[in-house]
Amino acid sequence: MLIKAQMVPMPVTAGEKFREAVYFFNRMTETRTNVYLFPFHFSAFLSALRSVTFYLQAQFRGNKVFETWYSKKQEQMRGDPLFRMLKEMRDEALHARPIQLQFLHGPTIPEEGIETTHLEIGATTDGMGEVRTSIKVGTDGEEKEVPPLVHWVVDLPDEINILEACDSGLRRIQALLKGWNELCKEAG
């Protein structure tokens, strides 16, 4: 026997949507060495980050102080190359096709460095999507698996580091929310 139940919708604020974007950014960081999972978390991050401003507008619709303040902020965001890029990538991922991500990868080199006349580097992706790297130092050395370094990029005019761009976008949205909260406190 099954009993039907319905969840009571909880009001979702812009702050909660921001925490959702942070959640997916953290998942991106945790899965940056996984070619299957990272793109999913990136797509979810883009949607969550974009929804923060939608929720902010819905939350304060009809508030004249907010509407005056936000119209100026909206113009600033439209003129911001980073926000435009993130919005365009979100629109592409949501409405057209997956974003054409690329990744740069290589082995982690020990802090003390490596001095050799022969170095072999191996790289592969395992069945679970994890990037694996190995190094062999010297012709007679043993091949050892080492942690991979992975940087996700999009090939625009310049290679843009995805994690750095998303981190900057998060910080700018956080500053926007903080600015509105401070204005609310001043207004009483």
Language-model segments: residues:
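Acidic, Ser/Thr/Gly/Pro-rich intrinsically disordered interaction regions
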Residues: L2-S43, S47, K64-G188
